């Protein structure tokens, strides 16, 4: 039988009925009969009269709030966190226990649509739903996991060469404010989702509504939206919503992996906002804060999300996660806790972005589990190491150059500095999603071409070309054409 879902949470009530005892912001205490206490994580619903709420909808007299049980606090009371604004909620209001956790629609019907944390559609009034899954689910068992390791080619030189991504792995994009995390994650959607052949799921966790709107319109124009599911819990949402929206998106992705037997790309922007929401909820529940004011359950909450993002027999979820680094401090507990779960970490650097080099990836701080000859081959590994050695030597010489000047270096070091500066510039690349702003077309550089170009750079074959020729270019053909134009101008 097909159920129709519009913008209301499923109302199948199998639990008890209680009454609101206290409301403090998004925290709601509810009293139930002793034999009807709901379980932890159960969804509760309560109707709010629009006459007492600031939010009015034409033609409707009530709206339904969804709460999630977080604690049993004694005296037949439970403490719940609201996933929507609680304005208009009053003491004594009837609260119904749904008897189950929050659930979201799954399946092909979700493709091409935008949802909130409750699985309500935001782009259309209603969709026909045949199946819903709860957002709280166990991670796959050990014997279900897939051990195969395969590289995911992106066509972005700095990533493919120095921090190669794993198909079915977890990828982290670390960076402070304004260094290009969201642009890079949108570029990954553009490059990988178009050629991927599977399904893409995007979770907007606590980020700007404008960015979500731009992403939806861009995907619609490019045609990618038909194989994409978007789930949003933005900056203006209560912390309970922002804490659960990642799980809602992941649940939809798991259905495609486990039931439809498809490979899935999961994009999460931003994991830090997930942690931040957990910290807010923890404080609201009165828990003792841990390091730097974060919740004591930080590692547990992160593990519950990350361990579900994995490959099972023959099919995978590949996740790309943007991680905001507060005050550019990579040792902050939020990014630090995320590190342990990732297969590849791409660190975006402010000093590099200040030079105008984009993507502003720090080639020395970024790492990958598969940067190993066993997975990527001897030639790729050797060239990547050569590039890193030259860049590290250039970094070591920075203080000497700043104090004495480049003329005081030995001839050998001068050659290394020249190559390092060319490498730095050649690691820049025009992005497809930035074409409208830069006026320059994006470029896709095959891995073999990237390896060959950097091998020639490291061995000195390109020392005769000017540094400017390497800036924001694709392959070597672009560099040589640009060098020719520069020579003609001079």
UniProtKB/Swiss-Prot annotation:
Keyword Cell wall biogenesis/degradation set for record: no
Gene Ontology molecular function terms on file: ATP binding; ATP hydrolysis activity; proton-transporting ATP synthase activity, rotational mechanism
Catalyses which reaction(s): ATP + H2O + 4 H(+)(in) = ADP + phosphate + 5 H(+)(out)
Keywords, comma-separated and alphabetical: ATP synthesis, ATP-binding, Cell membrane, CF(1), Hydrogen ion transport, Ion transport, Membrane, Nucleotide-binding, Translocase, Transport
Membrane topology designation: Peripheral membrane protein
Pfam families membership: ATP-synt_ab (PF00006), ATP-synt_ab_N (PF02874), ATP-synt_VA_C (PF22919)
InterPro entries documented for this protein: AAA+_ATPase, ATP-synt_VA_C, ATP_synth_F1_bsu, ATPase_a/bsu_AS, ATPase_alpha/beta_chains, ATPase_F1/V1/A1_a/bsu_N, ATPase_F1/V1/A1_a/bsu_N_sf, ATPase_F1/V1/A1_a/bsu_nucl-bd
Main location per the UniProt record: membrane
Binding site for ATP: 175-182
Listed EC numbers: 7.1.2.2
GO CC annotation: plasma membrane; proton-transporting ATP synthase complex
SMART domains: AAA
Family according to the record: Belongs to the ATPase alpha/beta chains family.
Function as written in the Swiss-Prot or TrEMBL entry: Produces ATP from ADP in the presence of a proton gradient across the membrane. The catalytic sites are hosted primarily by the beta subunits.
Subunit structure: F-type ATPases have 2 components, CF(1) - the catalytic core - and CF(0) - the membrane proton channel. CF(1) has five subunits: alpha(3), beta(3), gamma(1), delta(1), epsilon(1). CF(0) has three main subunits: a(1), b(2) and c(9-12). The alpha and beta chains form an alternating ring which encloses part of the gamma chain. CF(1) is attached to CF(0) by a central stalk formed by the gamma and epsilon chains, while a peripheral stalk is formed by the delta and b chains.
Protein name: ATP synthase subunit beta
Protein's organism: Acidothermus cellulolyticus (strain ATCC 43068 / DSM 8971 / 11B)
Taxonomic lineage of the native organism: Bacteria, Bacillati, Actinomycetota, Actinomycetes, Acidothermales
